[in-house]
Amino acid sequence: MKQLYFYSHGVRCAAWHLTAATDALAGESGRPCVVMAHGFSGTKDTALLGFAEPFAAAGLDVLVFDYRGFGESEGVPRQDISIPRQRQDYHAAIAAARHLPGVDPDRIVLWGTSYAGGHVIAVAARDQRVAAVISMNPAVDGVATLAHLRRTCGTGYLVRSTVNALRDVIGSALGRPAHMVPVVGQPGSNAVIATSGSEEAWLPVAGPTWRNEVRGRHALGVAFNRPITKAGKLNCPILVQPGTDDRIAPAVAARKAARRAGYWAQLREYPTDHLDFYDGPWQQRALADQLDFLKRDLAPTQGHLYETHSA
């Protein structure tokens, strides 16, 4: 695994490059490469190697990167969630991956989880050269997410999130320091993910560069995050992997995104909550399905068919 850097809109982003351990999937133009990043505030050292290393062992190069303002990447403000910026970083990472030695520039796979599970749909819809997409526990419809959070976390959660967002925005206008909120916390707290068991599931897998805070203003952008509207524009196979017990990103929205992708989509469902995908048996099950998908759909002679499965 090598450390490398690329630039996104003039800012240096940090990444890891894992070279394929085998030529099993190599073609005349080179090897396929998976471009992957975490969701929301996640960093490349938080549970992503558990996917990246098996991909490399199976014959794919992998580029794992941090968004601007997070982890080892440069950029200010720090810990500020911006959906447009994160998608710009995906496009920049794709450009970097296409210039890696031995990589086939037309066999780039996008991998995303949570917020990034939506990003990869929007990015692939714009970049029609992308060869395949993996969208795990994806947040694809902000409107559906807010309605879902009201049911799972209560109206008080939405009120607290709105207050924190306004406090951050108004405070900044008045020259005050950024108002930060925890990413994970106990039920009833100001945390973005405040469902029971969240801290216990997330903190053990969190990497050393991850910080348990983001700017409060993130909440104002949730409703506008609707990559589901781009799903019908995909021109490549996509594996959609929702958790049926997900208390953050509703499975119903992921199913709808898969239906909109139509012919290109494979839907695999798991009886899991949002954070269960990063460690343990369901991580292994999701990974196995991803490897099967990649081996099948990166073979040029294979056809594609919309499929629905429950684990």
Feature annotation, model-predicted:
Residues 163-229, 236:
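Alpha/beta-hydrolase
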Residues 92-171:
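Primarily recognizes the serine-hydrolase "nucleophile elbow" in alpha/beta-hydrolase
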Residues 43-47, 70-105, 280-286:
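Catalytic nucleophile-loop/oxyanion-hole region of alpha/beta-hydrolase
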Residues 1-29, 279-280:
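N-terminal cap/lid segment of alpha/beta-hydrolase-fold proteins
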Residues 247-253:
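Conserved alpha/beta-hydrolase "acid-adjacent" motif
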Residues 40-53, 67, 252:
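The serine-hydrolase catalytic nucleophile loop
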